Amino acid sequence: MHPRTLDEDLLSILAHGTLSIEGRMVDASNATLFGTVELDGVEVACVYKPTAGERPLWDFPDGSLGLREVAAYEVSAALGWNLVPPTAWREDGPYGQGMAQVWVVSPEGPESEPGAGLVDVVPAGQTPSGWIQIIEAHDHVGQPVALIHADDPSLRQMTVLDAVINNADRKGGHVLVGRVRVDDETSTFGVDHGVAFNEDEKLRTVLWGFAGDSIDEPLLADLERLNEGLLGELGDHLSELLTRRELIRTQRRVARLIRDARFPLPGDGWPSLPWPAF
């Protein structure tokens, strides 16, 4: 099993095509550039995050965030869930080496808003049917509100993926609905996985609605296949992106999820919600 069999054409374009920068996302904490990449007459819109633009963090090795984004794609692809847009490592670019990821085109409507119509903040006590309340708080003017997310199968997958990769920053705005190819149907994607795979437990997410629930059998079967891959070819490939200790901890998290067969609960030693939530 090797994840590069998925989206091989897009990965090749991302890694080897000619990259042209068209703009910058000014709200991002690290340099996040929007552009196009072209190879053999095929052009793809993408996000490019050069290593040189990464802000140093006390709890992650310098220059490693882009590699973690690639690793998150590899794990998602190995699970067969395709929750992470195709993401590849570039050895060169306008600002040096870094990761390139296919741009997710969102449709008009709620899916284009932060949270993609799947994560939201509503007045307290007004959680609609089919949604799960995570926490009550107060907004900027002191009104009581609730953070909620949909009871959606794609979010169950994303919750498991975040537990596997130890995602420290699953904000509502990191959940997208859209497509990466013009002829695709819209689907759910997760982005911004630079602060994942830490060897210490750092899971922070807005998707706590399934905490403690049993993990569905199909998801457990996918985790079993992932576990086999981590002990083989996939693990060998991820060893080029992560440290040995990080890879071992990833294997242990997968084994624990399979053993417990339950969605994880918030931990005590680390804030369980990202801030801001969007």
What are the residue ranges of the model-derived segments?
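Conserved kinase catalytic-core segment
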Residues: 81, 134-202, 250
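Serine/threonine-rich low-complexity intrinsically disordered regions
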Residues: 5-9, 123, 127, 265, ...
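Acidic-enriched, low-complexity/disordered segments with a strong bias for Aspartate over Glutamate
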Residues: 7-9, 27, 40, 59-62, ...
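ATP-dependent phospho-/nucleotidyl transfer catalytic cores
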Residues: 98-164, 209-213, 217, 221-248
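C-terminal catalytic region of ATP-dependent kinase domains
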Residues: 61, 179-278
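Conserved ATP-binding subdomain of kinase catalytic cores across diverse folds
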Residues: 13-139, 161-168, 179, 191
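Juxta-kinase regulatory segment immediately upstream of eukaryotic protein kinase catalytic domains
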Residues: 1-16
